[in-house]
């Protein structure tokens, strides 16, 4: 079966399982890597953080589906994980959800901003560092992620 078809079927079932478990699908990847084929499903918890238990329960359910449907003809590794502490920020919902958290934003013109997300209103992200506040239009963002705090 073609990779795109496998990915589509797995994503659909992953979204169903995630919804049942109060989770969301952050990403689904199926690709060949140096150690062989990898099916990577990244889950998210919209009201908190993903626990090891969340990954375990989700993994069991998706494994049942994969075994039953037998979509992948060759050997592969299944990985279920969270987006991580330094997770990418991928849209308005994330900027609202992570208000108060430390983030790094790189704009399309190459500028880098590191600061706390203060707000997201009408397409504008406001972040601040120790010195000042910055307002960044979401359309100008090339990439953004949370920064790990120690």
Curated annotation (Swiss-Prot):
Any Gene Ontology CC annotation: cytosol
Gene from which this protein is expressed: rimP
Coarse class of the protein's main subcellular location: cytoplasm
Gene3D superfamilies the UniProt entry points to: Ribosome maturation factor RimP, C-terminal domain, RimP-like superfamily, N-terminal
Protein localization: Cytoplasm
Keywords: Cytoplasm, Ribosome biogenesis
Record keyword Cytoplasm present: yes
Protein biosynthesis as UniProt keyword: no
Stored InterPro entries: Ribosome_maturation_RimP, RimP_C, RimP_C_sf, RimP_N, RimP_N_sf
Protein name (Swiss-Prot/TrEMBL): Ribosome maturation factor RimP
Function: Required for maturation of 30S ribosomal subunits.
Species in which this protein is naturally found: Thermotoga petrophila (strain ATCC BAA-488 / DSM 13995 / JCM 10881 / RKU-1)
GO terms, biological process: ribosomal small subunit assembly; translation
């Amino acid at each position: 079966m073609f990779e795109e078809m496998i990915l589509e079927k797995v994503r659909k079932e992953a979204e169903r399982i995630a919804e049942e478990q109060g989770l969301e699908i952050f990403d689904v990847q199926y690709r060949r890597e140096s150690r062989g084929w990898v099916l990577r499903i990244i889950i998210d918890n919209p009201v908190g953080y993903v626990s090891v238990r969340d990954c375990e329960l989700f993994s069991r359910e998706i494994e049942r589906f994969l075994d039953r449907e037998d979509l992948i003809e060759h050997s592969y590794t299944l990985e279920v994980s969270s987006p991580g502490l330094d997770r990418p920020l991928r849209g308005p919902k994330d900027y609202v959800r992570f208000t108060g958290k430390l983030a790094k934003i790189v704009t399309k013109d190459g500028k880098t901003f590191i600061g706390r997300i203060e707000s997201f209103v009408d397409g504008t992200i406001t972040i601040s560092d120790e010195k000042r506040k910055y307002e960044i239009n979401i359309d100008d963002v090339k990439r953004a992620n949370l920064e790990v705090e120690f």
